[in-house]
Structures are given as C-alpha cells and as structure tokens.
C-alpha cells in the first residue's frame, strides 16, 4: 500500500472513534 492509502484507512478508522468519544463526553456532561 502507498502512504496515501494507509493514511486514508487510518482516517476512516479514527474519525468514527473520535466522534464517538466526543459524543460520549458531551452526553456525560449533560
């Protein structure tokens, strides 16, 4: 795989995880 493909896969994997963490922290504060 090229560096671009690796970066794309990492981004696709990390974005939902980051969004879930942000949503979870927001819900925990409310």
Swiss-Prot record:
Q: What is its main location?
A: membrane
In this record, what's one Pfam family? PsaM
Q: Where in the cell is it found?
A: Cellular thylakoid membrane
InterPro entries hit by this protein: PSI_PsaM (IPR010010), PSI_PsaM_sf (IPR037279)
A single GO BP term for this record reads: photosynthesis
Q: Which domain of life is it from?
A: Bacteria
Transmembrane intervals: 6-26
**SUPFAM superfamilies named among the record's database cross-references:** Subunit XII of photosystem I reaction centre, PsaM (SSF81548)
Keywords from UniProt, A to Z, are: Membrane, Photosynthesis, Photosystem I, Thylakoid, Transmembrane, Transmembrane helix
Instruction: Cite a GO CC annotation.
Output: plasma membrane-derived thylakoid membrane
Membrane topology is: Single-pass membrane protein
Q: Which family does it belong to?
A: Belongs to the PsaM family.
Q: What is this protein called?
A: Photosystem I reaction center subunit XII
The gene designation is: psaM
């Amino acid at each position: 795989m090229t560096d671009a493909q690796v970066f794309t896969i990492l981004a696709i994997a990390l974005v939902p995880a980051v969004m879930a963490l942000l949503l979870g922290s927001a819900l925990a504060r409310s």
